[in-house]
């Protein structure tokens, strides 16, 4: 996947029938360690791998 600072990652709320509950911006991209940091402080690892799988609660929105 191709990420840029400012891309949005939506949060899906499993307690609300999976509806989108908000979005977090990508605030840091660490390509050397293959990690994205979101504005809520969470990290997504292996973000640039072909096998990248977002945690089930997140949906990528380019």
Indicate where each model-derived feature is located.
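Short coil-to-beta transition motif at edge beta-strands of beta-rich domains
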Residues: 1-15
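A generic structural signal for solvent-exposed, polar alpha-helical segments
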Residues: 9, 16-17, 30, 54, ...
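Basic/aromatic-rich interaction segments and small domains that mediate binding to polyanionic partners
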Residues: 12-48
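Intrinsically disordered, low-complexity, charged/polar segments
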Residues: 40-62
């Amino acid at each position: 996947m191709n990420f840029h600072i400012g891309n949005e990652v939506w949060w899906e709320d499993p307690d609300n029938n999976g509806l989108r509950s908000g979005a977090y911006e990508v605030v840091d991209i660490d390509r050397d360690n293959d990690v994205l940091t979101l504005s809520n402080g969470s990290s997504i690892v292996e973000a640039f791998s072909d096998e990248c799988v977002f945690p089930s609660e997140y949906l990528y929105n380019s």
